């Protein structure tokens, strides 16, 4: 049986902080870059007075089938929200609405993780596997996300994991 974590306010907060979903209104909403570590960066912010820290990366490559389908930028982030007792939540914003009632997959080497999808976001379906996924990400070279859009377009995004461990360590230290 899978344990599904239904996303809270983290995705809209992070998107707003990055300027992807409208302007952030308060100064605390603006993320502070804690450090850039190769392909990953660490950030912190305090929207609504609640501290949020996260490691963030863009894909190194993106493909669609059929080829050339337009979409918004994709991002992967791992967030820690102490006020919500959330630590190392893996999230993906894929840049298009996923096909309803479908899962995405995240692959690190030969290890696959099912991802629950909602609108343009994906989260690990079985929360009990999240620590194992983080450990695989820390040890891996890249992570591939595969999903299907509401229009049936298949996508494959490859994220480099170079710098992830350092960015994650920095974000975790900031949000102790």
Language-model segments: residues:
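N-terminal secretory signal peptides that target proteins for export/translocation
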Residues: 1-6
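Bacterial N-terminal signal peptides
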Residues: 10-21
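Hydrophobic alpha-helical segments and their boundary regions
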Residues: 8-11, 99
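A generic "folded-domain core" signal
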Residues: 25-176
